[in-house]
């Protein structure tokens, strides 16, 4: 069993989508189920509706999964297992106030050492604990041995007890912390492999320690994917980068298939540059992912997006553009030398159907050609249409072609009219209205 475990705290980041895609591909290769686990236990950070948005994006990218699970639904198990750990003296009630902990942090900063809990509450007697009438958290005792694990990408890791510390597993309101809820749920769901971002590497020994403390012996394999950098700045893709948001990329007109293609391609060894997710399932190897940070280049994505638009069926592209006519799909592809996204193609097509009243500098010619076209019969090809206008108006050169292009396309430059006309001829009545 594999899981994709996003938090509903904001727009989906391309790094999270990459994690989802890799989990999907590997689940297909291993013929194991993929579940979506919405990690919603941090109520203060949750944003209403973001869970639904996550699922909509996954469906848009055709990422198949068995079921959707909300982490908060497991609260009773989180609390029950925490009580078990306390009963077994593997965890303890911590009454230390936020103020005291902050003082300890400040002392650590002054000494130039990492902050670690001082263990004050760990040795309180049962009687002392019962006599304290104050809110408390639950801390898991630090391990008495090193925690080791092997990452399928990054190799071996070895953490000393000092690195792991005695950490909180239940907050004062008795909701679970991230590492604790994650560990318990991975146990309950029988997760076999965890694929996630490298920012979780330091969480892994804590999660292993939690499972060890609960007597869970099944090994879970780990893959921690390198972070994604902005190719222009060399810095980590953050919320300040518009392109870090999957929602923004979709709104800009990037096809889901192209985005998925690029996220798999980045920092990877692939047999071809342009492919679909289904094709990637046939050859993808998680161990081929580079250990170095991947670089997100929006221009490279634009190139890949053009290729995916080119590969679309004409009717399919037409429907994406808001029509149901294969000729409009062909028209959209005509603009790919100048446009790279669906949004940009729409911006090229919209002027064709806009109302045009005149063309500055060619007012009389514009009027003559438009009146001529309004009286004209149907012409199947551009040459016949052009010859008809020449015969009716005696116009030629730029006096003919500039206003004619503007009437037919709404712009003064673009692909050849001989290429455009066959694709818009059936809409001529709407165009010259």
Curated annotation (Swiss-Prot):
GO molecular function: ATP binding; glutamate-tRNA ligase activity; tRNA binding
Cellular component aspect of the GO annotation: cytosol
Main location: cytoplasm
A Pfam family reported for this protein in Swiss-Prot or TrEMBL: tRNA-synt_1c
HAMAP family: Glu_tRNA_synth_type1
Function: Catalyzes the attachment of glutamate to tRNA(Glu) in a two-step reaction: glutamate is first activated by ATP to form Glu-AMP and then transferred to the acceptor end of tRNA(Glu).
Protein name in the entry: Glutamate--tRNA ligase 2
Species of the source: Aliarcobacter butzleri (strain RM4018)
Name of the gene this protein is made from: gltX2
């Amino acid at each position: 069993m594999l899981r994709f475990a996003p938090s509903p705290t904001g727009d989906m980041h391309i790094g999270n989508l990459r994690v989802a895609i890799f989990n999907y591909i590997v689940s297909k290769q291993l013929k194991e189920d993929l579940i979506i686990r919405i990690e919603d236990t941090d109520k203060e950070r949750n944003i209403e509706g973001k869970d639904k948005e996550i699922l909509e994006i996954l469906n848009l990218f055709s990422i198949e999964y068995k079921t959707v699970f909300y982490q908060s639904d497991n609260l009773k198990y989180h609390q029950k297992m925490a009580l078990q750990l306390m009963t077994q003296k593997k965890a303890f009630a911590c009454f230390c106030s936020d103020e005291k902990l902050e003082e300890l942090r400040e002392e650590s900063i002054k000494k130039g050492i990492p902050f670690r809990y001082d263990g004050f509450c760990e040795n309180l007697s049962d009687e002392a604990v019962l006599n304290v009438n104050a809110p408390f958290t639950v801390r898991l005792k630090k391990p008495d041995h090193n925690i080791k694990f092997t990452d399928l990408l990054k190799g071996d890791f070895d953490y000393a007890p000092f690195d792991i510390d005695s950490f909180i597993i239940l907050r004062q309101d008795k909701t679970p912390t991230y590492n604790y809820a994650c560990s318990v749920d991975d146990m309950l769901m029988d997760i076999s492999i965890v694929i996630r971002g490298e920012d979780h590497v330091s969480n892994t020994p804590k999660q292993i320690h939690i499972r060890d403390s609960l007597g869970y012996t099944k090994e879970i394999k780990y893959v921690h994917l390198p972070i994604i950098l902005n190719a222009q700045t060399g810095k980590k893709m953050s919320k300040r980068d518009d392109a870090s948001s999957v929602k923004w990329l979709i709104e800009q007109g990037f096809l889901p298939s192209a985005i998925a293609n690029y996220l798999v391609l980045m920092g990877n060894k692939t047999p071809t540059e342009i492919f679909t997710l289904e094709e990637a399932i046939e050859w993808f190897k998680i161990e081929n992912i580079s250990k170095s940070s991947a670089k997100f280049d929006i221009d490279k994505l634009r190139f890949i997006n053009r290729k995916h638009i080119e590969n679309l069926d004409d009717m399919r592209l037409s429907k994406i553009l808001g029509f149901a006519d294969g000729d409009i799909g062909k028209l959209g592809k005509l603009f790919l030398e100048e446009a790279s996204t669906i949004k940009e193609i729409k911006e090229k097509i919209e002027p064709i159907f806009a109302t045009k009243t005149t063309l500055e500098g060619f007012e009389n010619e514009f009027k003559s050609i438009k009146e001529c076209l309004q009286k004209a019969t149907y012409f199947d090809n551009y040459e016949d249409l052009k010859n008809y206008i020449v015969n009716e108006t005696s116009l030629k050169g730029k006096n003919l072609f500039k206003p004619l292009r503007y009437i037919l396309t709404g712009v003064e430059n673009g692909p050849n009219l001989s290429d455009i006309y066959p694709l818009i001829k059936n809409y001529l009545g709407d165009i010259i209205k």
